[in-house]
Amino acid sequence: MHSDSDDYFSGDDDDFDRQQEIARSAFADMCHDWERNQKYDRALQLTIERLHCEGKEAHVLDIGTGSGLLSMMAVRAGADSVTACEAFRPMADCAERVIASNGMGDRIRLVKKKSTELKVGAGKDMERKANVLVTELFDTELIGEGAIATYRHALQFLLEEGCRVIPDKATVFAQVVECPLAMSWQTPKLLCSSDGDVLLRVPEEMVNCRGSSAVFDVQLSQLPLESFNALSEPIPVFEFDWSSREALKFKRHSRNLLKVQSSGIPQAVFMWWDLKMDLEGTVLLSCAPFWAHPDFEGLKTQKQNDSIPEPNLIPWRDHWMQAIYFLPHSKTPLAKGEEIALDAFHDEFSWWFGLNDLSLDPGHCSCGMHIAYSRSRIGQLNDGPRNKRILNYLEEVLDKNSVVLVLGDGSLLGLSIRAMGAKKVILVETNQTSRHCMERFVEHNGLENVEILSCLDDLTPDATADITHIFGEPFFTSAILPWENAIQFIWELNRVKALLNHEVSVIPHSFSIYGVAVEFLDLQKISAPLGTCEGFDLSLMDRMIEEHSKVADSPVEAQPLWEYPCLPLGPKCKMITINVAEGSQNQLEQGKITLTRHHEIKECNGIALWAEWHMGKNVSPKNTISSGPLSVIDEASELPVRPLQWNSNWRQGVHLLRKPLEESKMFLSWTVKYNAQLKTCYFKFD
């Protein structure tokens, strides 16, 4: 994806990467987190006030200052001195300007280094050790950005004995669950025909694999409550005392006895954490999902807007979410009332969990599938309605004489064509790990007349002479936005067609890109201007992010919209349809997305986009595969008054408006340009 210009950024790659890093950084997202800001501010006020009451000065160190916000809060709270450090140079330069524009340039000493590089002493980075540390070094896993090592270094070299630390402590919570939806993103299932006949069985090593070791961070509040069975209450499994170097260990284990509250198979652990911001624990910041959030019941009684669902009543943030950790594979159910031991482990950066297993090692993928494919791709492979629709169409158009070339990565549907009775299947698998996975499926299922090629160049003239059909789901691991799969399929298809001297049937026949105007409840905050934040002017940071975003970012980005609720403000709009067989031709389309209920809703702040694939020439719901909303939002239907339900196995496209659309406007103009040679679609919105 690129901007609405065909020209690539002309600077060097390092400069482009740096601009993109600034544009996509979470600095603005964190500053939009009003609860975080207010609770850091309150903790600073309480801490500095208490030190002064004890007759002590408050010398504050702010590690990773970002915008400079926490340092400015410390000055406002009465700190006697403030030293801030920021290693990311563009952000440090911006913080310097922000601090100066707020009249605090002479009150805050900004050092453009990592905290581990700071030196203490006369004429050095810090004149003296600090007795107050304020920092935000956390991610969804709490420790994934190296918080333990940073705190340990600061406590040893940069802080006085008995210093105050903000936040003071963190508690990690875990909840054991049975969650088929989460498991659909982890473990491939049997693939069956519409008659229930098994087409492909899954190799045991893939069923039993622990999966990817990368954190699975999600907005747990958006999981439907009916999609999981809580086998336990949330329990605290670890506490981190950020003021004690001795207590901050790089590796720990805890065994936690709990009573099963609901019968079921233990499949996963939901994890989150909270922060006690001050020494006395009077200020608490929780990252819990709504059903476990300490403020939820109180917020529910204050609810005034019926359009906001209960999961969105709690403070929203995207920089700290919750995480899912898969337990070692088990088919043994737990009984209600049974006592079990939840073993929790962490190293310097990550977590893992087990049941009744003191020696459990960190999980990693041993089968290759979780290395080759993302969790959402595994979800697509397990998507029953999608698979059924595609298989039904393939059963209609293929017969025992069909020789099918499959283009794409990890297509179990393509592989199943042989099990359906086709004469031969040829898979092109350019990714070595994906190719190994497909070979294991072939071997495990005893499939014959299946040829797996490492590249199209391996396609022989004899093989091409027999091809009757070319099929793609389509899916390619290189694609980010859903329609990029179809565009890559067209590119590969054109290469194959150059080798053919006869006509073949191509599936899918075409694809379309749709858009709808929406009001995001929270997602718009990741790019919305900050302006004033807790009384401080951050407009200079707004300007920096906007300038870099214009250069480095596409107007359409990928987001899993099932995690980010939005309300539709009008019917869906078909923006472009591309015939796959004729996809070598450039195409330009223009139009308007209409808003039929703009006056009812607070604001239009974005456009949601998705792709639909049409298997055959005659387009119908039966042969259409959508990566978009599950709700009907056409002109003939009444728009839903609740947030749209989205396909949770895809990331959709999102265009976020820098400023909400004016209330008087009832449409938004758009241009889509498909460039076949550059393999991309350009979008422009006015």
UniProtKB/Swiss-Prot annotation:
Annotated GO biological process: peptidyl-arginine methylation
Highest rank taxon of the organism: Eukaryota
Residue ranges annotated for the SAM-dependent MTase PRMT-type domain, each copy included: 5-352, 357-686
Catalytic activity, EC: 2.1.1.-
The keyword Transcription regulation is annotated on this UniProt entry: no
Molecular-function GO term, any one: protein-arginine omega-N symmetric methyltransferase activity
PROSITE patterns: SAM_MT_PRMT (PS51678)
Keywords: Methyltransferase, Repeat, S-adenosyl-L-methionine, Transferase
InterPro entries from the UniProt entry: Arg_MeTrfase, MeTrfase_PRMT7, PRMT_dom, SAM-dependent_MTases_sf
Gene3D superfamilies: Hnrnp arginine n-methyltransferase1, Vaccinia Virus protein VP39
Function comment: Essential arginine methyltransferase that can both catalyze the formation of omega-N monomethylarginine (MMA) and symmetrical dimethylarginine (sDMA). Specifically mediates the symmetrical dimethylation of arginine residues in the small nuclear ribonucleoproteins SmD1 and SmD3.
UniProt-listed PANTHER family: PROTEIN ARGININE N-METHYLTRANSFERASE, PROTEIN ARGININE N-METHYLTRANSFERASE 7
Family note: Belongs to the class I-like SAM-binding methyltransferase superfamily. Protein arginine N-methyltransferase family. PRMT7 subfamily.
Protein name: Protein arginine N-methyltransferase 7
Source organism of the structure: Aedes aegypti
